[in-house]
Every structure is written in structure tokens, then in C-alpha cells.
From Swiss-Prot:
HAMAP family: DXP_reductoisom (MF_00183). This is 1-deoxy-D-xylulose 5-phosphate reductoisomerase. 1-deoxy-D-xylulose 5-phosphate binds at K121, S147, E148, S172, H195, S208, N213, K214, E217. NCBIfam families: Dxr, PRK12464.1. The gene is dxr. One of its GO terms (molecular function) is 1-deoxy-D-xylulose-5-phosphate reductoisomerase activity.
Length: 380
């Protein structure tokens, strides 16, 4: 029986993580979770899983939840997130919160020698050097939950990582993959939220449409697998059947395939190095698929992917700036305060405005994050 702490239980990855726990009650126990502002959902999780701790975002929600939480302790805010991440009984901490708020809980959980199931992209994007140094220092495993990084992780099982020639990350292309840039001037929030292949939260669905999601994954892959940016490619693959590939020195390519279902990489992270049945996921029959399609990525068409490569190669504090600018811009688009292509413009402005710090401390990263958010808000 593995004890799990789950940060971000009410989001897309969080709810599917609970699906995995539900499928294997003899294998996993939820000891703590966070649920942001989603109090009704938190009540349901408490009633079903009887965890010891729940964290919510706002202090005013604590009393509401305490009235129905029974023996479950209710905490709140950033300190509450840390309490969930540092639960003494938790062996695995799944970080599924969205945004840079996931950084500090990850670092503290690593220091407490917890195994990390990492679904929070921003942790590695903003502070990859700090996170990987801490993981090495404390001998902690970072297990990828993203389907693309899980695919690479599985392809590398038993392989000599020094023999890697290239990582090939696949991209569905998002909601607007078939639109021209001219057509993107007129797209709506509702259009952007209709992803052709995956069911995800609103922020990541917009990131998928701008291709920033793939850019964040490139930076993540650089840190997780220690591969230079020049050896990480992105290929457009509309069917989302091949989740990523690894090319080795001898030009052989290993690929991980499967029907699009986030529970597969989530469960693999929780069971690694073992596997468990996942009987209600769709079996992949290639003869039903027929043809798989691949296209070279156009970084002028998808400018956010180019920004991510530039930020990653620049290094230091630049990825944190790009990430903070993107979070503010995406939120403004979701609120219908800016157009879709303005997201790119705001990110570019923030990156051009920033003076890079080569090896920022945690405090500097948090300061840069806050300053960038203020700068972008002033531009809107």
C-alpha cells in the first residue's frame, strides 16, 4: 500500500489521479490533498477517501469545510499546500497544481525525501536547476506524469542515456492546428477550449492551442533527461497515438504508443517500476487507426514554441519570465480581455524587457515571477 499526497485534486490531472486510486484501493491510500477553491469537490473526496489533511486556497473556506470534514484536518493557503506536500506518511507526492505555485511544495517535498510525481510543468520550467540539484542531493526520484515525458521515460528503461541522439516530442497541434495565422486573429475562447484529442483544464488547453504547452515540455525534457535543446525536436502528430520517441546513436528509434488517456502515465508514475491493469482504457488497435500523420513544426506559425526554445537556451531567469508572462496572458485571454495572438505579443514583450540572471536563487525566481506578472498586467 502506497500513501499518496495529491496537490491539485480538483484539476484535470488530479481528478484522473483519483480515478487511478479508485481503481486500485488495495494499492494506494490518499493521505492528503489540496483542492483550491473547489469546496464541493473537496467534500466528496473527503467522504470517499477519508484523508488526514485537506488544503484549500482561501481562509474563509476553512470553516465551511470543517463543518463536514469529520476527522480530516483542514488547512489553507501556501502553508496548507506545504503541509499536504510534507505529510509524514506520504511516500509519493503528485504535484498536479497549475502554475508556479507548485514550485515551493516540490522543493520542500524533495528535501523531505518524498518521491515526486511531477505533473506541474512550471516547477521545472522556472527552477529546473534548483529542482534537479535538490533531487540529486537528496537522492529523490522525479517521475514524469505528462504523457510525453512518461513516454520518453519508458523508452529509456534499461537504456544507456549517454547513447541518446535525440528526443522527439509529439504535439497534437491543439485546437487551431489547421488554421492560418490570419484566421487566428478572429478565434474565440470557446474555440480555443475545444481540444481535438485530450480532455484537459482550461489553462493547459489554451497553452496547447498556442503551442506554449509543447514549449514548456521541451524545457521540462531538458531538465528531466539532461539533454541539450539542440537534441530535442517537436513533431506535429495529429492522432496523439505516439506520445514521444527517443532516437539513439545507431539511429534506431524507440516510441511509446497508446490511446490518449492521461490515466496511463499517471498510473505508471504511481506504480513504477511495476505496472497494474487499466482495463477500462481503450485498447489500441493500429488497424483501426489506419494512417498516422507527422509534420515538421513551423516555429513562425507557432511562435510560443520558438519563445520556449529561446528562453531555454538563454537559461537562467528567462524561462521564469516567459512562464509568468504566459500565465497572466492566458488568464486575460480566458477572461476575454485580450485576443488570442496578443498572448504571444505579451510574452515577447516581457522577455525583451528582462535582464537575465544567470543562476537565480529561489527568492530571485519568486521576485522575478511577481515583477513579470506586474509588468504584463500593465500592458493589458
Amino acid at each position: 500500500m502506497k500513501n499518496i499526497s495529491l496537490l491539485g485534486a480538483s484539476g484535470s490531472i488530479g481528478t484522473q489521479t483519483l480515478d487511478v486510486l479508485r481503481s486500485h484501493p488495495d494499492q494506494f491510500r490518499l493521505v492528503a490533498f489540496s483542492a483550491g477553491k473547489n469546496i464541493d469537490y473537496a467534500v466528496k473526496v473527503i467522504q470517499e477517501f477519508s484523508p488526514q489533511i485537506v488544503s484549500v486556497q482561501r481562509e474563509e473556506d476553512v470553516l465551511k469545510l470543517q463543518a463536514v470534514s469529520g476527522n480530516t484536518k483542514v488547512v489553507y493557503g501556501s502553508e496548507g499546500l506545504l503541509e499536504v506536500a510534507l505529510h509524514p506518511d506520504a511516500e509519493i507526492v503528485v504535484n498536479a497544481v497549475v502554475g508556479s505555485v507548485g514550485l515551493l511544495p516540490t522543493l520542500r517535498a524533495i528535501e523531505a525525501k518524498k518521491t515526486i510525481g511531477i505533473a506541474n510543468k512550471e516547477t521545472l520550467v522556472t527552477a529546473g536547476h534548483l529542482v534537479m540539484e535538490a533531487a540529486r542531493k537528496h537522492n529523490v526520484s522525479l517521475l514524469p506524469v505528462d504523457s510525453e515525458h512518461s513516454a520518453i521515460f519508458q523508452c529509456l528503461n534499461g537504456e544507456n542515456e549517454k547513447r541518446i541522439s535525440r528526443l522527439i516530442i509529439t504535439a497534437s497541434g491543439g485546437s487551431f492546428r489547421d488554421k492560418t495565422r490570419d484566421e487566428l486573429h478572429h478565434v474565440t475562447v470557446e474555440d480555443a477550449l475545444r481540444h481535438p484529442n485530450w480532455s484537459m483544464g482550461s489553462k493547459i488547453t489554451i497553452d496547447s492551442a498556442t503551442m506554449m504547452n509543447k514549449g514548456l515540455e521541451v524545457i521540462e525534457a531538458h531538465w528531466l533527461f539532461g539533454i541539450p535543446y539542440e537534441q530535442i525536436d517537436v513533431v506535429l502528430h495529429k492522432e496523439s497515438i505516439i506520445h514521444s520517441m527517443v532516437e539513439f546513436e545507431d539511429r534506431s528509434v524507440m516510441a511509446q504508443l497508446g490511446s490518449p488517456d492521461m490515466r496511463v502515465p499517471i498510473q505508471y508514475a504511481l506504480t513504477y517500476p511495476d505496472r497494474l491493469p487499466l482495463s477500462d482504457t481503450k485498447q489500441l488497435n493500429l488497424w483501426e487507426m489506419g494512417t498516422l500523420h507527422f509534420e515538421k513544426m513551423n516555429q513562425e506559425r507557432f511562435r510560443c514554441l520558438r519563445f520556449a526554445y529561446e528562453a531555454g537556451k538563454t537559461g537562467g531567469s528567462m524561462p521564469a519570465v516567459m512562464n509568468a508572462a504566459n500565465e497572466v496572458a492566458v488568464e486575460a485571454f480566458l477572461q476575454k480581455r485580450i485576443g488570442f495572438l496578443t498572448v504571444e505579443d505579451l510574452i515577447e514583450k516581457a522577455m525583451n524587457h528582462h535582464n537575465v540572471i544567470a543562476r537565480p536563487s529561489l527568492e530571485e525566481i519568486l521576485e522575478i515571477d511577481a515583477a513579470t506578472r506586474r509588468f504584463v498586467m500593465e500592458q493589458i
